[in-house]
A protein has these predicted regions:
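Flavin-dependent oxidoreductase catalytic cores
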Residues: 1-217
Length: 217
């Protein structure tokens, strides 16, 4: 599919247009019809009425290294086929953001616990990616400003991770928020699991400026 990706990037970068490849792994949010036992940091599954999500299998050290290799390999393919840059998806409850959430990641090894440990997989990916694609190929990360869930990834932790990513060589950080359990950002009433959701400020809702406070910080 190398030639197909080249044709795609050629079409997408005409007239000085940029075309970035977003790279992601669904983790525990993989539909059960696709994988009834998906990989995740811990065996904490989603409970969404009417949806089929399997109980996750906690990742081994070998799994972690394999996922890192796959993210880096895909980034190299993006560069070699002419994409402008890559974005690693670490928001909305996908695998990388699952590592950041203390509500989902209850590991007691070097990949869990402190925010430094929970962000480790990100930093390893960025480090390896830089070695493979060089300094002149842009790298972005899509990062939750918060999960908007009790006990989840907080704005204060997100700011710390953003600083880590910048220091690691990330060029652009796109801010987002929420997970499958809290898919909308306008308040508890929009949540699938309201008991675990945090209320958004009314002033923020009125402006539809969901990440304004985070950006100001």
């Amino acid at each position: 599919q190398f030639d197909a990706l080249k044709a795609w990037s050629k079409a997408g970068t005409k007239n000085n247009t940029q075309l970035w490849m977003q790279i992601s792994h669904a983790g525990r949010q993989t539909p059960g019809e696709i994988n009834s036992s998906p990989m995740a940091p811990s065996a904490i599954g989603l409970k969404i009425p009417g949806k089929n999500f399997g109980t996750p299998t906690p990742m081994t050290e070998e799994d972690m290294l394999d996922v890192i290799d796959r993210f880096v390999f895909t980034a190299k393919i993006a560069r070699d086929t002419g994409f402008t840059g890559v974005q690693f998806h670490s928001a909305h409850g996908y695998l990388l953001s699952e590592f950041l959430s203390p509500d989902i990641n209850n590991r007691t090894d070097a990949w869990g616990g402190s925010i430094e440990n929970r962000a480790r997989i990100h930093l390893e990916i960025i480090k390896r990616c830089r070695q493979e694609v060089g300094e002149d190929f842009p790298i972005s990360v899509k990062l939750n400003s918060a999960d908007f869930q009790k006990g989840g990834f907080s704005p204060d932790e997100s700011i710390k991770v953003a600083q880590m990513l910048e220091n690691a060589g990330v060029d652009i950080i796109e801010i987002s928020g929420g997970t499958y359990e809290q898919p909308k950002l306008i308040g508890v009433e929009a949540s699938i699991n309201a008991k675990r959701s945090e209320k958004r400020k009314e002033s923020t809702i009125a402006r539809e400026a969901y990440f304004l406070e985070y950006a100001q910080d």
